């Protein structure tokens, strides 16, 4: 098993493909090019991709090389064609050899796309296994002490979607509301921050 990273933040990786380009077109092209070269070099028995990020576009090279493709989190849909993830999902679902849907609902979306049932399996979400495998480390973590936080007395925030961060109106509306919430409940906010969000916050002065 070889875990590959194309540019997002991840602590476990065997190969790093510096695929981040100057713009979206360059990044997507780099992902396909770098992964294709890696597949030629390593000759994998299969390629497993998770989710709907741009890194999933690596399957295009795998398909051309006749390498079996396995897609975890297949079949998810939000029915919003403006979201880049929706395009990625459709591409990867269609060309994957095996689609692993987390729910029966997602499986039905795959069936609606015309995918044969022998290429689709409902596996359930791996979240329970992820939590169980990391529970011991979570329980002894000193993160509250390091960040000077009191258990149950802070707000955990995750907000990184492109339409919320890159659209100025949505961005200011979102973080004005977040600041108001912090003031109302008199709690600090712990923000698990994507690089795009961090840069936007620094530039805006929030």
Question: What residue ranges belong to the model's regions?
Answer:
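Single conserved hydrophobic/aromatic residue that forms the stacking wall/gate
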Residues: 1-7, 11-12
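Donor-nucleotide binding loops and adjacent catalytic segments primarily
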Residues: 6-8, 138-206
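Short, hinge-like loop/turn segments at secondary-structure boundaries
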Residues: 8-9, 65-66, 86-90, 117-118, ...
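Conserved beta-strand segments of alpha/beta enzyme cores
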Residues: 13-15, 119-121, 188
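Active-site and donor-binding regions of nucleotide-sugar-utilizing enzymes
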Residues: 16-116
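A nucleotide-sugar donor-handling region in carbohydrate enzymes
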Residues: 19, 95-170
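Phosphate- and divalent-cation-binding pockets in alpha/beta enzyme and binding domains
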Residues: 57-58, 109, 130, 199-201
């Amino acid at each position: 098993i070889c875990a590959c990273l194309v540019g997002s933040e991840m602590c476990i990786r065997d190969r790093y493909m510096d695929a981040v380009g100057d713009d979206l077109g360059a990044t997507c092209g780099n992902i396909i090019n770098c992964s294709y070269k890696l597949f030629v070099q390593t000759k994998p028995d299969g390629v497993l991709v998770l989710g709907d990020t741009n890194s999933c576009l690596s399957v295009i090279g795998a398909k051309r090389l006749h390498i079996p493709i396995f897609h975890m989190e297949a079949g998810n849909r939000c029915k919003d064609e403006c979201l880049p993830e929706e395009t990625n999902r459709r591409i990867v679902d269609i060309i994957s050899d095996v689609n692993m849907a987390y729910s029966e609902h997602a499986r039905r979306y795959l069936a609606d796309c015309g995918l044969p049932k022998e290429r689709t399996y409902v596996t359930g979400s791996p979240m329970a296994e992820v939590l169980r495998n990391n529970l011991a480390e979570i329980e002894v973590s000193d993160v509250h002490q390091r960040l000077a936080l009191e258990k149950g007395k802070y707000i955990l925030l995750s907000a990184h979607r492109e339409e919320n961060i890159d659209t100025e109106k949505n961005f200011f509306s979102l973080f004005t509301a977040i600041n108001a919430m912090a003031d109302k409940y008199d709690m600090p906010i712990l923000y698990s921050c994507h690089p795009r969000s961090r840069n936007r916050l620094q530039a805006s002065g929030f």
